[in-house]
Swiss-Prot record:
InterPro entries in UniProt: CsbD, YjbJ_sf
Organism: Lactobacillus johnsonii (strain CNCM I-12250 / La1 / NCC 533)
Source superkingdom: Bacteria
Name by which UniProt lists this protein: UPF0337 protein LJ_0034.1
Residues annotated as signal peptide: none
Biased composition (Basic and acidic residues): 44-53
Family: Belongs to the UPF0337 (CsbD) family.
Region (Disordered): 27-53
Length: 53
């Protein structure tokens, strides 16, 4: 299954962010936020592509 909407990245990123907050690992927290942003970009790109079709 293709993750066209970035859902996997959004969920995995949120989990990493929460894990980082709980453990005090700032790098893990930032990594999670970056992965969430990647998911949002994928989602927006898919939305734009669908609008153009």
């Amino acid at each position: 299954m293709e993750d066209k909407h970035g859902i996997k990245d959004k969920v995995a990123g949120k989990l990493k962010e929460v894990e980082g907050k709980i453990t005090g690992d700032k790098a893990r927290e930032v990594e999670g936020k970056a992965q969430q942003a990647k998911g949002k970009v994928k989602s927006k790109a898919t939305e734009v592509k669908e609008d153009l079709e």
